[in-house]
A protein has these predicted regions:
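Long, intrinsically disordered low-complexity tandem-repeat segments
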Residues: 8-16, 23-32, 36
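Conserved active-site tyrosine of GNAT-family acetyltransferases
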Residues: 129, 134, 156
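Conserved acetyl-CoA-binding loop-helix of GNAT-fold acetyltransferases
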Residues: 87-104, 126-131
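Conserved catalytic-core motifs of GNAT/GCN5-like acyltransferases
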Residues: 115-118, 135-152
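Acetyl-CoA-dependent GNAT
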Residues: 1-9, 34-45, 49-86, 101, ...
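Conserved GNAT acetyl-CoA-binding A-motif
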Residues: 74, 105-118
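Conserved beta-strand-loop-alpha-helix junction that forms the acyl-donor binding cleft
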Residues: 86, 116-126, 144
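Glycine-rich acetyl-CoA-binding "A-motif" of GNAT/NAT acetyltransferases
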Residues: 57-61, 124, 150
């Protein structure tokens, strides 16, 4: 079952009357917990222009953007889906929400390319990125230490 993305915006305390909200309390009070919605939130003041950004899709997981290159409009992406929500469409919904956030034509941090470096043994992550339309653009031999030994890394890329 596909997930319907509702709002995709940073979380700012000033947008809420109760200034005691944090990412955690926002999850408890404002994020719907049904099977058809997902929202990405960032900590107040967080911005990709600083070079990296973590977006939360509570309670499902989070997405990191890092190695932001404003000249070439690209960033690396990493995703973590909580164990109990894996293989239910939340990872794909999180990727799509992120892409929607950074392809807006008048967004000063609009991206042209997203890429992910994935440990070759992580077949679930490779399958997720393929399903989201990413294609393999690189293969690095023994690039990453994973479970106490070095493994190959596959670079996946998507032109937005």
């Amino acid at each position: 079952m596909g997930k319907n993305i509702i709002t995709v915006e940073p979380f700012h305390e000033t947008a809420h009357k109760d200034s005691t909200h944090t990412v955690e309390t926002f999850h408890e009070t404002a994020l719907p917990h049904d099977e058809t919605s997902l929202q990405l939130v960032a900590e107040e003041g967080a911005s990709l222009s600083s070079g990296s950004l973590r977006l939360y899709a509570l309670p499902y997981g989070c997405i990191d953007l890092y190695n932001y290159d404003p000249v070439n409009r690209r960033a690396a992406i990493g995703i973590m889906v909580a164990t109990e929500y894996r293989r239910q469409g939340y990872g794909l919904a999180m990727l799509k929400a992120l892409e929607n956030l950074y392809v807006e034509p008048f967004n000063e941090t609009a991206l042209h390319t997203l890429y992910a470096d994935i440990a070759a043994p992580n077949t679930a992550s490779l399958a997720l990125f393929r399903k989201a339309g990413y294609t393999q653009c690189g293969h690095f031999k023994e690039w990453l230490e994973y479970d106490s030994h070095f493994v190959d890394t596959i670079r996946m890329q998507k032109i937005l």
